[in-house]
Amino acid sequence: MNNKILSQDTKAMNTKLFSAALLAALTLAACGGGAPAQPKGPISEDRTAAFKSMMPEFSSMGKMVKGEEPYDVEKFKQAAATFAETSKKPFTFFQSDDKGNGRALPAVWSDAAKFKAEEDKFAAAVEKLNAAAQTGKLEEIKAAYSETGASCKSCHDTFRAPEE
């Protein structure tokens, strides 16, 4: 009997650790990193800057969701509302840039309908996160945060070149 309890506790702990690791990986993946090997023109630079401008709020929310920082309802509400606004800006910079598109793959423009569907999925996930944040219900928030991160990953996997 104790082995079953230990096994269930171990499974629950492993599930929590996996979830925390996944959230951390998604957050880091969304942050970007060093200089890309792909050339960037001014539109691409603006797009990158707009994506990076979203990260302080997303990272702050992630720390609370993962339990790395105490959950502060008001701080989370504000971060989610700000993130909902700043998350719209990068998508105003997806014109092709003849000076270089950075890590954006040609599929962004050659499969514009699929890219638009990913953008819409992301916008819906962000709105769901903001709505959940305004309720203050942490379990709803965790699910919505995870969905938002998964939406980022889905788009990056299809439309962004890996870092070299």
Model-identified regions with their sequence ranges:
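Short regulatory "switch" loops immediately downstream of catalytic or recognition motifs
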Residues: 1-2, 96
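Bacterial N-terminal signal peptides that target proteins for export
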Residues: 3-21
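Polytopic transmembrane helical bundles with strong interfacial aromatic enrichment
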Residues: 14, 32-36
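Processing junctions and N-termini across compartments
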Residues: 25, 146-149
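C-terminal motif of bacterial Sec signal peptides marking the signal peptidase cleavage site
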Residues: 27-30
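Extracytoplasmic c-type cytochrome modules immediately beyond a signal peptide or single-pass transmembrane anchor
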Residues: 37-147, 164
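The canonical Cys-X-X-Cys-His
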Residues: 148-160
